[in-house]
Amino acid sequence: MEKNMVDLSKRRWFTPNRQPNQSQVRLPWLARPDAFTDECTRCGKCVTACETHIIEKGDGGFPNVNFSMDECTFCYQCAQSCPEPLFVAQSEAPWQAEVNITHHCLAQQQVECRSCQDACPEGVIHFALQIGRTASPQVNSELCSGCGACVSVCPSNAMTVHYTQHIA
C-alpha cells in the first residue's frame, strides 16, 4: 500500500458483528426480477462464482446480494455461472440504484467521517462544506452504479443501497 493511503478495511474493526441495513437485493442483470423466484433453481453456482463473496443464499435458498463485507465489481461471473437463462447481456445496465444515507451517519452527528466518499469508485459521494458544522454527505444518485462499496466501509452502518428497478 502506498504511503498516506487509507486502508479502508481497518475501519471495519470498529463495527464487529454488524448486520446489513438494507432490504433484500437480488442479483444484477436479471432479465425478469419479478419472476426470479419462479425461474431460479437455487443451485448456488452464482454464490460460489462471486469473486467478492457478496452473493449469499437468502430466504428460501434464493441468492441475494449482501454488501456488508464488500462491493459488487460487476464481473458478471454470477450470470456466466448460471445454468438458467435468467440474465441479460453484460453490456446492459445491471440495475438502477440509489444510495440512501440514514440518520446514523457520523457526519450528520457532527463527527468527521468520509469513509463512503473514499470507497466510492464512481466518485458520486461528496461532502458539502458548511459553516460551523461538519461537512454533509451528498450523493449524485444519477451516476451511482449500485456497487455497494460505500456500505461495507461505513463505520455506523448508515449507508443503504435501494434498487429503484432492474433494467431489462
Predicted features and spans:
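Non-ligating segments of multi-cofactor redox enzymes
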Residues: 1-168
